[in-house]
């Protein structure tokens, strides 16, 4: 199996290959048959659906273990960890700092953290130093790059926030509204559990103090705390106000007392989980990177090739670094790979596809 090099990436981008793909199967860290807990969505629901089992060809029940959006966020954070490490790679990012404020802790948000990347409202509503004054980011030279960016001219965005060209961007809150810059995701990844069977989960709490419901009534105080004294309680129309949404003043409303054991649906056993990552080369080839004062021709073609290769390399690096961090998705949902991480270059028939290996160190080189 061949190492994946930058020259191979350039050849793939310059040719007609369809995509780079990495498919990895997993089992729960507790072993086959151990229960895993998927993410919950509104109403405490799991994302279940029927899919064709890629191994048996049968239609089976599946559950989503990590969504496309979540995987993109994890890849961005994997890149951020690499950038923060000593001797890490260099990558253009935006960063806004909330220093010199009354916040209890200092907060820093980068374009690898913000949900909408460089087009996020956090950056839109921030100030940037330009010359001898501070101006709103979108009114600055860097901010106006978004106004000028599209598929035919992504040069400025490549220098400002290249991950936006990889993970996708829609500048829907900018001055052009819904007509703002829009770039599709070039890389898509998700983890799905196949052969999913829902189980049960239990919940309870034993209070070592054995505080009973009838022990006392609990009242609100003016400073947001609680008290057992009516005299110290916050009052509404002359009456002491009890804690709790229903105003019952129970000890359980301030997290004391036992919680009776309960049983509900929760967790799944699965036959296996599969992580599928696809990096679309046609999506990258749609991007154009004109140079200032360029007359086109050979210079433009070379600029397009190099810029596209950078985006593909960035995607390979992000996905590889994420896999090497491990698949500990959330509490009670740790997965262990069943094999090595292999990238496949999907070529258009009759050309044959090729497989490659790359590790995190190589991906960052």
List the predicted regions and their residue ranges.
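Basic polyanion-binding and macromolecular-assembly surfaces
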Residues: 1-38, 42-63, 83-86, 93, ...
């Amino acid at each position: 199996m061949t190492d994946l090099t930058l020259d191979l990436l350039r050849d793939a981008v310059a040719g007609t290959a369809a995509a780079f793909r990495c498919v990895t199967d997993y089992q729960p860290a507790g072993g086959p048959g151990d229960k895993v807990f998927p993410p919950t969505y509104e109403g405490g629901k799991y994302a279940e659906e029927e899919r064709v089992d890629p191994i048996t060809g049968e239609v089976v029940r599946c559950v989503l273990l990590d969504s496309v959006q979540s995987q993109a966020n994890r890849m961005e954070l994997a890149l951020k960890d690499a950038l923060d490490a000593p001797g890490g790679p260099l990558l253009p990012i935006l960063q806004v700092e909330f220093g010199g404020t009354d916040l209890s802790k200092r907060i820093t948000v980068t374009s690898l953290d913000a949900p909408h990347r460089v087009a996020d409202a956090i950056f839109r509503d921030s100030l940037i130093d330009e010359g001898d004054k501070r101006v709103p980011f979108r009114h600055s030279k860097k901010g106006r790059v978004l106004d000028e960016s599209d598929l035919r001219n992504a040069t400025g965005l490549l220098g400002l926030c290249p991950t936006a060209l990889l993970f996708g961007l829609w500048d829907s809150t900018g001055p052009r509204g819904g007509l703002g810059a829009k770039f599709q995701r070039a890389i898509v990844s998700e983890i799905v559990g196949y052969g999913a069977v829902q189980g049960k989960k239990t919940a309870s709490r034993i209070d070592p103090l054995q505080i009973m419901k009838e022990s006392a009534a609990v009242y609100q105080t003016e400073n947001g705390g609680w008290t057992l004294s009516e005299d110290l309680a916050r009052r509404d129309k002359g009456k002491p106000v009890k804690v709790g949404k229903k105003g019952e003043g129970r000890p359980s409303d301030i997290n004391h007392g036992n919680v009776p054991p309960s049983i509900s649906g929760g967790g799944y056993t699965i036959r296996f989980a599969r992580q599928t990552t696809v990096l679309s080369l046609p999506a990258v080839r749609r991007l154009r990177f004109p140079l200032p004062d360029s007359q086109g021709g050979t210079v433009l073609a070379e600029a397009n090739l190099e810029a596209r290769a950078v985006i593909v390399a960035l995607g390979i690096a992000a996905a590889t670094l994420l896999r090497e961090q491990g698949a500990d998705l959330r509490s009670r949902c740790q997965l262990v790979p069943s094999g090595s991480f292999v990238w496949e270059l999907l070529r258009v028939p009759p050309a044959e596809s090729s497989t490659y290996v790359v590790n995190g160190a190589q991906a960052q080189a």
